[in-house]
């Protein structure tokens, strides 16, 4: 009687070691294990590389890494992974009890359930309509960027034609012409560019036929009496301050973006890209190396004194070379630390009357860049990567510095037409690209679990 019992026990042990008995090769549980959790596969999902994982393991991996690649071989997958139905049915038939227990454990884990939901939502966004949506999305994305490239090509051709046809007129600007050679019409043009208020004195300068040489001889006393009769002391002060700058330079100083670009093509391109990619370092550069000509007018424009904020126009603020007060420094440093792009937007806002569309492009781009910066900070905080901030800051500083040094070294070799294309690309096309980046960040944020 004891021997049959021993035979029964040995047979049960063999059944436990080999749950599936057949006339062919025997199958063990380890052959159907996930390479992430090393347990029986639940809803096995097979990637393009051929590796299979539990769907919730793949979702957890995607949530933590934000990468669409295989956890084992790191090969990127295409499309959105789906459950391997044939493999799932086979495992459920071979190990029904183990699968049932694992499914119950998964359903009771809120983190896993939320990760699966976010992962599935990400897949729905990738394929919202039909199985062929992936190809449609690729065509749609390709169509968008091909449209941008087509527009850029068209603009480049227009700029090429304009560059060759307007070369003489560009050199004919007052910023390139000696003041003693100005005509009466050019003197009036210089006067009108001081501000809307200067149109009050336009006819007086025309009637007196004031040319460049005569302009250089005028004094404050002559401006205050007939025939000029400029009674407003603020207007006289602005005209005299600007006249002193003209006398010192010998030409008209730049008073808008296009004149500044004509006089300083390299610096304008450098500042545009520096303030776009790294506004804090760009403003620090202005403070250290261009304090009087650029930084002082900038801080007086964006952080004006209370008594001057309503009475002065933009040109008067540009001529204000007084040292900033502590109140101005405090306002500037707060915005500089937390919202640097707002400083650029506020500066562009004051130029709306002079540059109607260009200022609006700059304001929109500054808003978009602020949103992208907030997304970057949120990503660092949500991933608990605050310790990497110093290293990121150093890498960013090194990248911007090397790019600036590279540009300074090779600037004489770069054709002016290429520089113009880069300038207009950053000015007008960069906001379109940033809109697309913000939309992608918002969609990515919707798939994250809070």
UniProtKB/Swiss-Prot annotation:
It is an enzyme of class 2 (transferase). It is found in: Endoplasmic reticulum membrane. Mediates RING-dependent self-ubiquitination leading to proteasomal degradation. It catalyses: S-ubiquitinyl-[E2 ubiquitin-conjugating enzyme]-L-cysteine + [acceptor protein]-L-lysine = [E2 ubiquitin-conjugating enzyme]-L-cysteine + N(6)-ubiquitinyl-[acceptor protein]-L-lysine. Its EC number is 2.3.2.27. The chain crosses the membrane at residues 141-161, 332-352, 361-381, 405-425. Residues 162-331, 382-404 are extracellular. Membrane-bound E3 ubiquitin ligase that plays a role in several processes including apoptosis regulation or reticulum endoplasmic stress. Has anti-apoptotic activity, both for apoptosis triggered via death-receptors and via mitochondrial factors. Contributes to the dynamic control of IRE1/ERN1 signaling during ER stress by inducing BAX inhibitor 1/TMBIM6 proteasomal degradation. Promotes the activation of TGF-beta signaling by mediating the 'Lys-63'-linked ubiquitination of TGFBR1 which is critical to activate the pathway. This is Bifunctional apoptosis regulator. It comes from Rattus norvegicus.
């Amino acid at each position: 009687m004891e021997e049959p019992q021993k035979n029964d026990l040995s047979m049960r042990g063999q059944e436990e070691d080999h749950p599936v008995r057949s006339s062919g090769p025997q199958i063990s549980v380890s052959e159907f294990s996930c390479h992430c959790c090393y347990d029986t596969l639940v809803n096995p999902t097979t990637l393009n590389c051929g590796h299979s994982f539990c769907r919730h393991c793949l979702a957890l991996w995607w949530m933590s890494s934000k990468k669409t690649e295989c956890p084992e071989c790191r090969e990127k997958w295409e499309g959105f992974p789906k459950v391997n139905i044939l493999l799932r049915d086979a495992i459920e038939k071979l190990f029904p009890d183990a699968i049932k227990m694992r499914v119950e454990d998964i359903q009771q884990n809120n983190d896993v359930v939320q990760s699966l939901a976010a992962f599935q939502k990400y897949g729905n966004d990738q394929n919202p309509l039909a199985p062929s949506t992936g190809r449609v999305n690729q065509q749609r994305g390709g169509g968008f960027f091909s449209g941008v490239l087509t527009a850029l090509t068209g603009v480049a051709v227009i700029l090429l034609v304009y560059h060759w046809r307007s070369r003489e007129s560009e050199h004919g600007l007052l910023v390139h012409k000696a003041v003693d050679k100005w005509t009466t019409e050019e003197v009036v043009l210089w006067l009108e560019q001081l501000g809307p208020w200067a149109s009050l004195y336009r006819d007086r300068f025309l009637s007196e036929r004031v040319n460049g040489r005569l302009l250089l001889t005028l004094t404050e006393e002559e401006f205050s009496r007939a025939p000029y009769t400029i009674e407003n002391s603020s207007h006289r002060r602005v005209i005299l301050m600007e006249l002193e700058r003209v006398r010192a330079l010998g030409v008209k100083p730049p008073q808008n973006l296009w004149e500044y670009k004509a006089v300083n093509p390299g610096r304008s391109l450098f500042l545009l890209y520096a303030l776009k990619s790294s506004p804090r370092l760009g403003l620090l550069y202005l403070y250290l190396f261009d304090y009087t000509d650029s930084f002082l007018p900038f801080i007086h424009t964006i952080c004006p004194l209370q008594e001057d904020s309503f009475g002065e126009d933009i040109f008067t603020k540009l001529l204000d070379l007084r040292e900033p007060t502590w109140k101005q420094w405090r306002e500037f440093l707060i915005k500089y630390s937390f919202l640097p792009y707002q400083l650029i937007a506020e500066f562009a806002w004051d130029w709306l009357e002079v540059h109607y569309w260009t200022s609006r492009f700059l304001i929109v781009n500054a808003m978009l860049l602020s949103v992208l910066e907030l997304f970057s900070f949120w990503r660092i905080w949500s991933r608990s990567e605050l310790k990497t901030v110093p290293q990121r800051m150093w890498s960013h500083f090194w990248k911007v510095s090397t790019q600036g040094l590279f540009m300074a070294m090779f600037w004489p070799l770069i054709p002016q037409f290429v520089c113009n294309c880069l300038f207009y690309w950053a000015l007008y096309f960069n906001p379109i690209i940033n809109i697309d980046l913000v939309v992608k960040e918002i969609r990515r944020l919707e798939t994250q679990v809070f």
